[in-house]
Swiss-Prot record:
The name this protein goes by in its record: GTP 3',8-cyclase
Binding residues for GTP: R16, R66, T97, K158, R261, L262, R263
Reaction catalysed by this enzyme: GTP + AH2 + S-adenosyl-L-methionine = (8S)-3',8-cyclo-7,8-dihydroguanosine 5'-triphosphate + 5'-deoxyadenosine + L-methionine + A + H(+)
Binding site for [4Fe-4S] cluster 1: C23, C27, C30
Annotated cofactor note: Binds 2 [4Fe-4S] clusters. Binds 1 [4Fe-4S] cluster coordinated with 3 cysteines and an exchangeable S-adenosyl-L-methionine and 1 [4Fe-4S] cluster coordinated with 3 cysteines and the GTP-derived substrate.
Amino-acid positions noted as binding S-adenosyl-L-methionine in the UniProt annotation, renumbered to this chain: Y29, G70, S121, M192
A single GO molecular function term of this UniProt record: metal ion binding
Organism of this sequence: Lactiplantibacillus plantarum (strain ATCC BAA-793 / NCIMB 8826 / WCFS1) (Lactobacillus plantarum)
Binding residues for [4Fe-4S] cluster 2: C256, C259, C273
Record keywords, A-Z: 4Fe-4S, GTP-binding, Iron, Iron-sulfur, Lyase, Metal-binding, Molybdenum cofactor biosynthesis, Nucleotide-binding, S-adenosyl-L-methionine
Pathway: Cofactor biosynthesis; molybdopterin biosynthesis
Length: 332
């Protein structure tokens, strides 16, 4: 088996696969309030195309798949997609990133289909803030979904928390305390300038030093830990707490050095780097493994050493154009 390496000798064994660009929320850091039409149904990869695509990747050494969106649980065939992907020879870890609104209903069938891990977006514990950040979401549905999923013994449940200055950065302690009695990994994520105006990002970006400061100010002793999984987070556990917390800081501390992932958009493009505009249409080659591999290798050969999300804060020249897609169109 000839595995996938980029020009910097980074092994790629992980695919993040978006199965829809549609979402039942419009989170402020992911989608504009209006004016972003969803892809027509025939533009989105079918279930059979998805499975064949993953079979191609598995033959090239990919063993881990994360299903994303949009909101992946909006697809009525999501459980069957999970079941079929997990059945592919060589795929040993399947996870999903979801907003959790449908999780109370779908957590059990997803677990039975073979889902290993869950990432749930939850940027606040306050109902009014949640409604504002998500532009209309009901936080109780998410909390109910987390409660159901927590009883099903997934390998790991993670909460994704995008910190936004002036909106939720005062809730760090609440999330840290949540890990005391809940076996979850609360992951604080820096707000990224993807699909947002630069001016908005510069105003609302906040670094993650705040998390350590909060621990120190409240007498919370913590130590680094290693979590099995695919993410770029640095992970820690507070002494005596059941769960843990993680930091994902693409701006203040790049995670590119060990990048092992490729992103597949819902309409069948491969993006080797989250931030670059460059993408290659692989849909027409899904049925031809040889042609498929050539396109994937082309994407890897062009993959940059680092993204340049923080270019606005420096005098560096940008090597490539930033992505034109919003996060929901890439796959979160």
């Amino acid at each position: 088996m000839e595995k996938l390496y980029d020009s910097y000798d980074r092994l790629h064994d992980y695919v993040r696969l978006s199965i829809t660009d549609r979402c039942n929320l419009r989170c402020v850091y992911c989608m504009p309030k209006e004016g972003l039409p969803f892809f027509p149904t025939d533009r989105v990869l079918s279930q059979d195309e998805i499975v064949q695509l993953i079979e191609n990747f598995a033959a090239m050494g990919v063993s881990k798949v994360r299903i994303t969106g949009g909101e992946p649980l909006l697809r009525t065939d999501v459980v069957e997609i999970v079941r079929r992907i997990k059945a592919v020879d060589g795929i040993n870890d399947v996870s999903i990133t979801t907003n959790g609104l449908f999780l109370a209903k779908l957590a059990k069938p997803l677990k039975e289909a073979g889902l290993d891990r869950l990432n749930i977006s939850l940027d606040t514990f306050k109902a009014d803030r949640y409604k504002k950040i998500t532009r209309g979401g009901n936080i109780q549905q998410v909390l109910d979904g987390i409660a159901v999923a927590s009883k099903l013994h997934f390998k790991k449940i993670k909460l994704n928390i995008v910190l936004i200055k002036g909106q939720n950065d005062d809730e760090v302690l609440d999330f840290l305390h949540y890990t005391k009695d809940h076996d979850v990994n609360a992951r604080f994520i820096e707000f990224m300038p993807i699909g947002n105006s630069l001016k908005t990002w510069q105003k609302e970006y906040v670094g993650l030093k705040n998390v350590f400061d909060t621990c120190k100010d409240n007498g919370l002793a913590y130590h680094p830990i290693v979590l099995r999984g695919n993410g770029p987070s640095d992970n820690y556990q507070i002494e005596g707490y059941e769960g843990s917390f993680g930091l994902i800081h693409p701006i203040s501390s790049k995670f590119c050095e060990n990048c092992n992932r490729l992103r597949i958009t819902a309409d069948g493009y491969v993006k080797a780097c989250l931030y670059w505009n460059e993408e290659i249409d692989i849909r027409s080659a899904i049925g031809d493994p040889v042609a498929f591999r050539k396109l994937i290798q082309k994407a890897l050969d062009n993959k940059p050493l680092n993204h340049e999300m923080a270019m606005s804060e420096t005098d560096r020249i940008i090597d490539k154009a930033p992505t034109w897609r919003h996060m929901s169109q890439i796959g979160g």
